[in-house]
Curated annotation (Swiss-Prot):
SUPFAM superfamilies documented for this protein: Gated mechanosensitive channel
Its biological purpose: Channel that opens in response to stretch forces in the membrane lipid bilayer. May participate in the regulation of osmotic pressure changes within the cell.
Keyword entries, A-Z: Cell inner membrane, Cell membrane, Ion channel, Ion transport, Membrane, Transmembrane, Transmembrane helix, Transport
Major localization class: membrane
Entry's transmembrane regions: 16-36, 88-108
Subcellular location field: Cell inner membrane
GO molecular function terms noted in the UniProt entry: mechanosensitive monoatomic ion channel activity
GO cellular component entries: plasma membrane
The protein's assembly and partners: Homopentamer.
Family: Belongs to the MscL family.
Lineage: Bacteria, Pseudomonadati, Pseudomonadota, Betaproteobacteria, Neisseriales
Name assigned to this protein: Large-conductance mechanosensitive channel
Membrane topology recorded in Swiss-Prot or TrEMBL: Multi-pass membrane protein
NCBIfam families: mscL, PRK00567.1-4, PRK13952.1
Length: 153
């Protein structure tokens, strides 16, 4: 079998296509969550804390060789060659990760619940026999009929 044909069989399998779709949707979901955190959630939190812009919350560890601080933004510090600890960007990434992890947890939890419902076997019908005197259905191991009280063999 040629390498091209083997690759085609591998690529067309359902699992590979599902994985590719998952990666694309995951990337899109990640960018939506990043925008949600950066543009919707963190600005009000920064306002409540005291007019803090988390995207520009940083500490200068070492001034830049091109220009000494203070720097108005992370971009200005990086342009000057300063070494910075970007705490605000880390907080934004942490909030984004928490939202994505919680969404994935809820999705997996729902899928597992559906799998358990599918996998639950139907309860087996009780083994019964017919009473030869009154013809009612009685348990297989019964020695006396509960309906007519006849002694069974």
């Amino acid at each position: 079998m040629s390498v091209l044909k083997e690759f085609k069989e591998f690529a067309v399998k359902g699992n590979v296509i599902d994985l590719a779709v998952g990666v694309v949707i995951g990337g899109a979901f990640g960018s939506i969550v990043k925008s949600l955190v950066d543009d919707v959630i963190m600005p009000p939190i920064g306002l409540l804390i005291g007019n803090v812009d988390f995207s520009n919350l940083f500490f200068v560890l070492k001034d830049g060789a091109k220009q000494a601080g203070p720097y108005v933004s992370v971009a200005a510090a990086k342009q000057a060659g300063a070494t910075t600890l970007n705490l605000g960007l880390f907080i934004n990434a942490l909030v984004s990760f928490t939202i994505v992890a919680f969404a994935i947890f809820m999705l997996v939890k729902a899928i597992n619940r559906l799998k358990r419902e599918e996998a639950a076997p139907a309860p087996a019908a009780p083994a019964t026999k017919e009473c030869r005197y009154c013809l009612s259905a009685i348990p297989e191991k019964a020695t006396r009929c509960p309906c007519c009280t006849s002694q069974l063999d």
